[in-house]
Amino acid sequence: VGDLMSEDTLEENSDGDDWHLYASADYGAAESVEKTEPRNEEDADDEWFDGDDFYNQGESIDWDAPPCPAPLGIAHVIKIGACDHCLHRIGGRRTQSSGFEGGALLRKEAFSRDPSLSESDIPELCPLCENLFDDVGNIAERIIETLEGTKFRSMQLGIHIPKDLLQSEDAIRTKHGARGSKPLKTSFATAIQAEMLRKMSDIAFVKEYPDVMVTVDALTLRVDTDVRPVFIYGRYEKLARGIPQTRWPCRSCRGRGDGCESCEGTGLQYRESVQDIIGEPVKNSLDASDTSFHGMGREDIDVRCLGSGRPFVLEIKNPKIRDEDPISLESKINSNCPEKVKVNSLRWCHKKDVSRVKETRSEKSYTIRFKIEDPPPEGQIIDAINGLSGVILEQETPKRVSHRRAAKTRKRKIVSISNVVVEEQEIQFSLRCEAGTYVKELVHSDEGRTVPSVMSVIDRECEVLWLDVKEIHAD
C-alpha cells in the first residue's frame, strides 16, 4: 500500500470533482470535523431532555454537577459510566498519554482523591459512546482486509453514528465536558485514523480527492469502500475502418442479459471498439473493473483518424494499482492491435480533464474521396471545389443522425480547401473546417440539406467513397 504516483505526477485538482462534497456531509477527515461551533448550553439541554427525568442505566445524571476539568466534574463523569477514552476527551486535562491510557490516568487520580468512588457502582456502558471506542481496532482491521491488494496513497474516512447517540453525547459533553472537548464523531474518526496509521504509516487522510473513500457504520460496524477512478489522457489514431469509438450495444438485445443470436452472446453490435482496444490492456495492467471512454468528438465507424490522433481521456474504474508508468501502458496498448489503433502522449490526468476534452471545439482537417458520373471538365471541377473555401455552410441535421441529434440548421465554416485531384470519375480533396461540420454532407448535400455543397457547385450526384480525419487542431 502506498506505492503510488509521486506528488509531481499529478497536480492538485481544485474543481471538476465531486469528492469534496463529502466534506460537508460529515465524511471528512479528523481535521474537517474538529471545528466545534459554539453552543448555547441552555438551548442544547432543552432540545431533548427534561431535567432530572433523564436516566442512564439507573444512574441519574446530576445536571447540576460542575463541568470538567473540575475534580467533582471528572468524578461525576466517571460515576455515570464514561469509558477511559471519553473521560480523556471531555476531561480537559493534559496527560502524558491519550485515548484509553490518558483516561485511565485521570480515573486513577480521581479514585485517589475520592475514596467513595467504586468501580462496582459504575455502569458498564459508556453513555457518551456506547463503548464504540472498544471497536476501533476491529474496524481498522476490517478496512485493511477490505482493501487488501489495493494500492493507494490517500484515504477519506466517513463515519455514520446513530442520531440519538450523537444527541445524547452532545448534551452530556456540552453540560459536563471541558470547554473545547471534541465531539464523538471527530474523536471516533481520529481514533480509527490513528490505528490505521499505526498499521499503515505510508497513507494520508484527506478531506477531498482521496484515492479511496471508506465509510463506517458505527451501529453495525459495517465497512464500505469506494476506490476512486484514475484518468489517463492521450491521443489515438484509428488506422482501420469499421471500428466504433465506444462500445456499441447490439441493436437486437441492447446488450441485456447474455446477449442474443444476432450478437453471438457478446451484447455488442461490433466486437471491437477504440475504447476496448485501448482500455483492455490498461484495465488488466491496473487490475480494474471497467473503463469509460471520453473523446474530443468522434469519427464515423467507416472513417479513419490519422495525424497526431484524437484527444481522449480514459477513465479506469476501481483500480487496484494506480502507479503504472504511462510509457509502459502506451507500449502495451500499441502492441495490442497495432494495425487498428495506436496511442501517443499518454499521461495521468484529473477528472476535470474529461469535461475539458469533451467541451473543446477544435478545427479539423480531412481528406475525402468521392465518385461522380459523367464528370465535367477537370478544370471546372477544381475551380468549383476550390470556390467553397471560406464559405459558411448551412447544414440541417443529416438524415443519418436525426435519431440522436436535434433537428436544426447549423452554420459551419469551411476554413480552406486544397489538393483537389481529379482521376477520371473519382475526385479527392483536402479541407480544414470548423468543429461540427458534416463533411460527407458537404459533398453529397444530403438531398439538399447542406447548402452549398460540392454536388450543387458541379451539378452532379456525388457518392462518397471514403473519408479520413487528417488532423485535429487541439492544443
Predicted segments with their positions:
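Short, Lys/Arg-enriched N-terminal segments with co-localized hydrophobic residues
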Residues: V1-L4
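Non-catalytic RNA-recognition surface used by pseudouridine synthases
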Residues: S6-D475
